[in-house]
């Protein structure tokens, strides 16, 4: 059985669910660095956008009953490969110890001024 997870603390769209639980797993859709309070990107830098994208993802995890330590896999999509080091700076602050599994690849669509998108999976051990 699947359950949709949503929160006003992260960007949303009628085209996708912010998160979906299936069994003990919570799948979070790709989130950009958009700040829902302003409707704008958190800033022009990869660090600012990565940090905000991760905060958006965490808001969805928390709405689904999880927490940061429940995140088991992260996929980061970069618009520009040269932003890899800057993304890692922000990522390391978010996951300073015991980071989840991760993949980094190129973002396949061009979104104006968007440097990064993050999607992830959390394991919600409710047993």
List each language-model region with its residue ranges.
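N-terminal presequence-like segments and the immediate start of the first folded domain
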Residues: 1-55, 59-72, 78-127
């Amino acid at each position: 059985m699947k359950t949709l997870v949503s929160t006003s603390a992260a960007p949303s769209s009628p085209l996708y669910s912010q998160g979906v639980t299936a069994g003990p797993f919570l799948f979070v859709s790709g989130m950009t660095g958009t700040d829902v309070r302003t409707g704008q990107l958190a800033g022009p830098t990869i660090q600012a956008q990565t940090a905000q994208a991760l905060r958006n993802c965490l808001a969805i995890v928390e709405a689904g009953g999880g927490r940061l330590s429940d995140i088991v896999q992260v996929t980061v999509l970069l618009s520009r490969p040269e932003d890899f080091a800057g993304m890692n700076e922000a990522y390391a602050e978010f996951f300073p110890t015991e980071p989840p599994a991760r993949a980094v690849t190129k973002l396949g669509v061009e979104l104006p001024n968007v440097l990064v998108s993050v999607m992830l999976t959390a394991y919600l051990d409710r047993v």
